[in-house]
Structures are given as C-alpha cells and as structure tokens.
Design a protein with these regions (language model features):
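Short, cationic-aromatic polyanion-contact patches
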Residues: 5-13, 28, 61-80
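Short amphipathic alpha-helical interface segments
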Residues: 11-25
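Short acidic, hydrophobic short linear motifs in intrinsically disordered regions
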Residues: 25-35
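A short, conserved structural fragment
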Residues: 51-61
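Short gly/ser-rich loop at a beta-strand->alpha-helix junction or flexible surface loop bordering the NTP-binding
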Residues: 82-173
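Hydrophobic alpha-helical interaction segments
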Residues: 142-223
Length: 223
C-alpha cells in the first residue's frame, strides 16, 4: 500500500484520480482540468502530491497514472461529497428489480442516478450475490412511491441513497462502461470504494476482482 495523507480528499482530487485511472495515455494538465472541471493550478497541485506518492509519473507527453497505486490511494483517502446523511431503504423485491424500479422513479422526477456497489460490480465482474446497493443521486429522492420503506440503518437496508453535490460521481469516465441495459453505473473506481465502505470479506474479494478487471482493461468499452 502507498503512504496516504491524513486529510481526506475533496471532490476535485477524487475526480482527477478517477480520470487518471481511466486513461491509458499521457495527459496534460490542461486536458485534466477540462475533463474534471477544476482549475489548472489545482490540477498542478494534485499532480505534485500524487507524484511524490509515486502514483503518477511525468513524461514529455504528459502525466501517466499508476493505476494500482492510485486505486489504493482512492480507497484510503476518498470520501463522497454528500448534501446530507445517506438514506437507507428496504424492499423485498430481487435486487435488480429494486434498482430498476428506483431508476424508473428517479427518471419520473428528473433526478440523475448512478448505481454503485453491490449491484454494479455484479453486472461488470460478477462475484457475490448483491444484497445492498448504493445509489448516488443529484437531488433528494423519496422512494416510498417506488415501493420501498425506510430502514433504520444499513443492517436493515437493501438500498442506500446518497444525495451528492459532486456531479462527477454520477457518470463513469471513458472508456469505462457507463450503463448496462440502460441502467447508469458509477465509475468502477467508486464502486471499489463503496465495496470497501459497505464492508465484509466477500465484498473485499469482489473489490479485488473489480480491481483486476480495471487493471486488465476488461471494463473498457471498445470504440
């Protein structure tokens, strides 16, 4: 594992790291600033820190991330930017049916959605039966009309809704798959973080399987 900072990352740093993991070619500071939506001085500052951590190298053509080191840093330092506390919900339906219903309800209210662990990793690199799924949204979302009931906490929940102020969490960076059967997915690096956050040895195994798929390029959508 690489040495981590004591301060948690902001949304811009996290997005830059996800972007560096997604690309396989050298990228300039200007490209990264445009891609992520932060200032070039901020990009320079983040790249300097990542270079000192041996997670990024500078070449004559731009910056190249070391994917495995960057993923380790992301798992240790990232925290999603949330508007409020996550909201746990419960449903008796099969997991895929639950999330399809959640997505349909979100669409009816004009709410953007990105599906993360457990369901998204199961769609990309199946390993464990999904029992709880984190969903990121850009607005508060009441799931009562979608057939869910409020749960007391994670232990009772089958879905967790996280209202995020970070819109970069609502779509995967190219070339990663952004949807499966029209269901929008979070970036695989965020899925890895959520597997660790939800916890359990089987989820760590699922995260390792997803990491291997990222490192092997198996999740990239062919152009």
């Amino acid at each position: 594992m690489v040495t981590t900072a004591t301060r948690r990352w902001g949304a811009g740093t996290s997005a830059l790291v996800r972007a560096l993991i997604a690309t396989t070619r050298p990228v300039s500071q200007v490209e990264l600033a445009t891609l992520v939506g932060v200032s070039q001085p901020r990009v320079s500052q983040v790249l300097s820190r990542l270079t000192k951590s041996s997670a990024v190298t500078s070449t004559t053509d731009g910056y190249v991330g070391r994917r495995e080191q960057l993923i380790d840093l992301y798992v240790d330092n990232h925290r999603p930017a949330l508007v409020g506390a996550e909201v746990p919900w419960y449903s008796l339906r099969p997991m895929r049916e639950q999330i399809d219903q959640l997505f349909a309800h979100a669409n009816s209210t004009g709410t953007r959605v990105a599906v993360s662990a457990d369901l998204a990793p199961d769609l990309l690199a199946p390993w464990r039966h999904p029992t709880l799924t984190v969903v990121y949204v850009d607005d508060a979302l009441d799931l009562t009309a979608a057939g869910f009931v409020r749960a007391e906490g994670r232990v009772d929940a089958t879905a967790i809704v996280r209202h995020t102020s970070d819109t970069t969490l609502l779509a995967a960076f190219e070339p990663w798959r952004r949807s499966v059967d029209e269901l929008p997915l979070a970036d695989p690096v965020q899925q890895i973080w959520d597997l660790h956050d939800l916890g359990g040895a089987d989820r760590v195994d699922a995260a390792d399987r997803l990491i291997a798929a990222v490192l092997d390029g198996k999740l990239a959508v062919e152009s």
